[in-house]
């Protein structure tokens, strides 16, 4: 997301990546958004993540929020910019796993490679299939490519 934000020319923007696992996580996300607006009144606040995917209108209705972006759209080059308040598609229509960008690990000792996204189980207690979509696997060639890139950058 950082690369996409920089490429789009977003200068004074804050991206809030929300969680929907519990009501408390959503409450904390809304609290964080309100605090960020107080601390950075001129910043563009963009909300994404699972809670935003599931309840885009709830976040778009917050006066502090400038844009709500879905889980698929946050990885698109132009997904973070635009004047429409809500840019969220039907996650169940996504058939492929977006290329996971290997970024943001420069100062870290660990990095992660995404191999799968979504879930096909419909456990009665779990919201993940509705926030992340159906199970989609990254191709083995893409996983190997990502691992090789990390190894060449010094990760073990």
Model-based region annotation:
Residues 1-156:
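Proteins enriched for Cys/Gly/acidic motifs involved in redox and nucleic-acid/cofactor modification
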